[in-house]
């Protein structure tokens, strides 16, 4: 049987967990085997900028950070389950990628 590997990424961890919970519920309802959600390492993007626009004065800096949280879910590629997963309302800040594996 084919498997579907679902990769999820988001800067908002609450929205990410809601989508993974919905996928879990679909797997339980349809009786499909599922492994995950597996938390992948969080990517931290750091940007340091100088506060002063002209370069004069004391050197003070602003530090900004963006965290990208990722999850991985493997699920059997049952037609009913996949159709329901495609219908999930995914928030704008969550990216979802589905790959079929044999």
Swiss-Prot record:
<dbReference type="GO" id="GO:0000049">
    <property type="term" value="F:tRNA binding"/>
</dbReference>
<dbReference type="InterPro" id="IPR001848">
    <property type="entry name" value="Ribosomal_uS10"/>
</dbReference>
<dbReference type="InterPro" id="IPR036838">
    <property type="entry name" value="Ribosomal_uS10_dom_sf"/>
</dbReference>
<keyword id="KW-0689">Ribosomal protein</keyword>
<comment type="function">
    <text>Involved in the binding of tRNA to the ribosomes.</text>
</comment>
<dbReference type="GO" id="GO:0003735">
    <property type="term" value="F:structural constituent of ribosome"/>
</dbReference>
<dbReference type="GO" id="GO:0022627">
    <property type="term" value="C:cytosolic small ribosomal subunit"/>
</dbReference>
<dbReference type="Pfam" id="PF00338">
    <property type="entry name" value="Ribosomal_S10"/>
</dbReference>
<comment type="similarity">
    <text>Belongs to the universal ribosomal protein uS10 family.</text>
</comment>
<dbReference type="InterPro" id="IPR018268">
    <property type="entry name" value="Ribosomal_uS10_CS"/>
</dbReference>
<dbReference type="InterPro" id="IPR005729">
    <property type="entry name" value="Ribosomal_uS10_euk/arc"/>
</dbReference>
<dbReference type="InterPro" id="IPR027486">
    <property type="entry name" value="Ribosomal_uS10_dom"/>
</dbReference>
<keyword id="KW-0687">Ribonucleoprotein</keyword>
<dbReference type="GO" id="GO:0006412">
    <property type="term" value="P:translation"/>
</dbReference>
<comment type="subunit">
    <text>Part of the 30S ribosomal subunit.</text>
</comment>
<protein>
    <recommendedName>
        <fullName>Small ribosomal subunit protein uS10</fullName>
    </recommendedName>
</protein>
């Amino acid at each position: 049987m084919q498997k579907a590997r679902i990769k999820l990424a988001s800067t908002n961890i609450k929205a990410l967990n809601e989508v993974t919970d919905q996928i879990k519920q679909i797997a339980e309802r349809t009786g499909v085997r599922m492994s995950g959600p597996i938390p992948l390492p969080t990517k931290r993007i750091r940007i340091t900028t100088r506060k002063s626009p002209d370069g004069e004065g004391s050197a003070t800096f602003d530090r900004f950070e963006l965290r990208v949280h990722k999850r991985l879910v493997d699920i059997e590629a049952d037609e009913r389950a996949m159709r329901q997963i495609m219908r999930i309302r995914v928030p704008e800040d969550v990216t979802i990628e589905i790959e079929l594996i044999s």
